[in-house]
Amino acid sequence: MSGRMKEVVSWSPEEVTNWLMENAVPEYCEPLKSFTGQDLINLTEEDFKKTPLSRVSSDSGQQLLHMIETLKMAHHIEAHKNGHVNGHIHVSVNNTAHENGFSSKTKLNGVPNGYKKEMIKIPMPEPERLQYPMEWGKTFLAFIYALFCFIFTTVTISVVHERVPPKEVQPPLPDAFFDRFDRVQWAFSICEINGMILVGLWLVQWLLLKYKSIISRRFFCIVCTLYLYRCITMYVTTLPVPGMHFKCSPKLFGDWESHLRRIMKLIAGGGLSITGSHNMCGDYLYSGHTVILTLTYLFIKEYSPRRLWWYHWLCWTLSMVGMFCILLAHDHYTVDVVVAYYITTRLFWWYHTMANQQVLKEASQTNLLARVWWYKPFQYFEKNVQGIVPRSYHWPFPWPVLHRGRQVKYSRLVNDT
């Protein structure tokens, strides 16, 4: 590294690109592809207010500017260190000069008369490593929380199923959507297929994320809090089946061994009707399928490059079509889908707003968001994450990829909606 520092001003564009890749800012490779080392160290804040640099990151280039300052400092230190080699330095003045009454005649050791020079070691900071610590132990705890909520949800569904009134006694409630659209039998299968596609896309995207530990913690915390809320709403108010087409499994009337087998079957099938594991009734308010369709889209969009607009639109279409098919199949009341969408989007936005603003991670009289019941766990999971998590990607496997494109990191702009 030191040999390279000495020649930073003479770097070629290829060397600048290599430096950007090594320092985990590959998103600047394209806009700076023709920059030399001299061009790189001459960058200012004004340059990041103009295109194309203004489109790369929402921090106005502060991270890269900080790294350039560190690079210039290291280059400056190396230059002075070279000047002290063999006990003398290079000076651009005559051997004898007078300044403030002192003689500045150069001595053998290279130090002018009346002055003392020392080399000071300035540590090179590595803010990115400290700013986004992985903390896999916390991620494991979030996974345990997710596992608990998933199991608890299946238990709640089994309990609520016993309380659902027979459809012959309590017919479906009136619903404006059902009045306007006849039931389409295969629509719910389309919903579940769309959901599986979105989950699959999110898993692939997650594998390629650089900060997958932080992001997976957020996903586990949000999705399981949503399902915990769902357990409460579907238990306190048991709605009748939305349609006469429902064929609910027989009630068990306290047979806990059969309850356990039914719970294990539901867990094994992922809670999906398409796998034949979900034939219970009562889990209507609110829709778990809508939660997954909405949340996977939100995470896909939040942590993928902005330039992949077609990818965002594809996932949005899959999500919206899936929710429409839930209603078209008459498998949920409209209120189930509306409430699920509202709660999912608000919790996602609240959580990320709090995570992206350092001041909201500290409880105070003016921080009303600190009054939510999950604030303490939130502080525990997010306290060491400093700022917005970059949309950075890397190849996670030990074997090289044949045609590896440039890595991209994007941060959401302030005015993004």
Swiss-Prot record:
GO terms for biological process: apoptotic process; ceramide biosynthetic process; inflammatory response; negative regulation of apoptotic process; sphingomyelin biosynthetic process. The chain crosses the membrane at residues 140-160, 188-208, 219-239, 280-300, 308-328. It is found in: Golgi apparatus membrane. Residues 11-74 form the SAM domain. Keywords: Apoptosis, Golgi apparatus, Kinase, Lipid metabolism, Membrane, Sphingolipid metabolism, Transferase, Transmembrane, Transmembrane helix. It is a multi-pass membrane protein. GO terms for cellular component: endoplasmic reticulum membrane; Golgi membrane; plasma membrane. Gene3D superfamilies: Transcription Factor, Ets-1. Residues 329-417 are cytoplasmic. Its main location: Golgi. Disulfide bonds: none annotated. It is an enzyme of class 2 (transferase). The keyword Transmembrane helix applies. InterPro entries: SAM, SAM/pointed_sf, SAM_3, Sphingomyelin_synth-like, Sphingomyelin_synth-like_dom. The active site is at H289, H332, D336. Its EC number is 2.7.8.27. It catalyses: an N-acylsphing-4-enine + a 1,2-diacyl-sn-glycero-3-phosphocholine = a sphingomyelin + a 1,2-diacyl-sn-glycerol; an N-acylsphing-4-enine + a 1,2-diacyl-sn-glycero-3-phosphoethanolamine = an N-acylsphing-4-enine 1-phosphoethanolamine + a 1,2-diacyl-sn-glycerol. GO terms for molecular function: ceramide cholinephosphotransferase activity; kinase activity; sphingomyelin synthase activity. The keyword Transmembrane helix applies. Belongs to the sphingomyelin synthase family. Major sphingomyelin synthase at the Golgi apparatus. Catalyzes the reversible transfer of phosphocholine moiety in sphingomyelin biosynthesis: in the forward reaction transfers phosphocholine head group of phosphatidylcholine (PC) on to ceramide (CER) to form ceramide phosphocholine (sphingomyelin, SM) and diacylglycerol (DAG) as by-product, and in the reverse reaction transfers phosphocholine from SM to DAG to form PC and CER. The direction of the reaction depends on the levels of CER and DAG in Golgi membranes. This is Phosphatidylcholine:ceramide cholinephosphotransferase 1. The gene is SGMS1.
